[in-house]
Amino acid sequence: MKEVFIVATARTPIGSFNGALAGVPATQLGATVIKAALERAGIAATEVNEVYMGNVLSANLGQAPANQASLAAGVPNSVPCTTVNKVCASGMKAIMLGAQSIMLGDNDVVVAGGMENMSAAPYYLDKARTGYKLGHGNITDGIIRDGLWDPYKDYHMGNAAELCAAEYHITREDQDAYAIESYKRAAAAWEKGYFKEEVVPVQVPGKQMVTVAEDEDYKKVIFEKVPTLKPSFQKDGTITAANASNINDGAAAVVLVSGEKLKALGLKPLAKIISFADASQAPEWFTTTPVKAINNALTKAGMKISDMDYAEVNEAFSCVPIANAKDLGLPLDKVNVWGGAVAMGHPIGCSGARIVVTLNSILHQQNARYGVAGICNGGGGASAIIIEKV
């Protein structure tokens, strides 16, 4: 099979819920990173063979969101586009599908990533077509219904995360401490300019054009309040608004090329994709499925977890990286070293791609070689990918 290389990455800043990016459609956020990634790669849009973009909350976004983003980025309308919905793993699965298409010889240049504007997700009027007739009616929150709700147990993903915390004896104090460290790592990474090369500023139109160039959420934490917050999902729970990820807006993308195209165009690679894998188990245990996906990817690569210099394990909840690191035998000082979704935010269709983008940056700026990224998704699934800095 053909080798696959990452030749460029880009991500938007991550906007707060109803924050600076709330008025920018997910498709426009996607277009921003597609265009930026191609420009950074030095590849003409006419060279692109296919586009894959993850997106979860597609209601009211219009037909074929990936196609909208691709066309808005200047990619020709002759290029096929596919929107991927694997809940929180959508952006990573898009990269995996793009890589597979190159490995199999179907494509030579693919743009892949994810995009989400959770702030813009609509409410649903469930009985609007048939009529409410008489009496009170309900509206359904599209964010919760299609993004954050387990339809099997009929509860919030946070309730499932409480199972993980209990099973692994992860206390409220453990999770709060992890969350505070995530915020501190994100702040330090921004202060040191670590994200500068991956982030592309977003122009937000209005009475005056506003440029958004930095993640919003990590600056809003008040550390003294973290231990005082009430549990979010059950009265005796340990998960709070501070030690869980937030609701956010953002996009991320990578440009993938075959080894042959790399040479033909004289491109400089950033990383090589070594392997990738999915895994699944009972829906309520999605929190620990990254362990299985990462181990599957390691097995395919003929590698061990000790070969990984750094890891990105998406922080859907603080208990997720804590539990997964424990099962994998990963020291936490190798995991999410620039902070994670708890501090930076979790635009669900984007995050799988975002952690790949950040992992690549970490490998380059920390002079490391191998990294693995893993992300859980609703329904009991997870995806993982191993990359090597080139």
Where are these regions (language model features)?
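Conserved active-site "lid/cap" helical segment
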Residues: 1-61, 65-73, 77-80, 160-172, ...
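Condensing-enzyme catalytic core mediating Claisen C-C bond formation in acyl metabolism
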Residues: 1-24, 139, 223-288, 292, ...
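N-terminal extracellular/periplasmic Venus flytrap/periplasmic-binding protein-like
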Residues: 11-12, 23-31, 40, 174-264, ...
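Conserved catalytic cysteine-centered active-site region
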Residues: 55-109, 152-156, 223-246, 327-354, ...
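Active-site-proximal alpha-helical scaffold in enzymes
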Residues: 84-116, 165-194, 253-260, 325, ...
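Flexible glycine-/small-residue-enriched beta->alpha junction loops
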Residues: 109-163
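Active-site pocket-lining segment
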Residues: 160-162, 195-198, 274-343
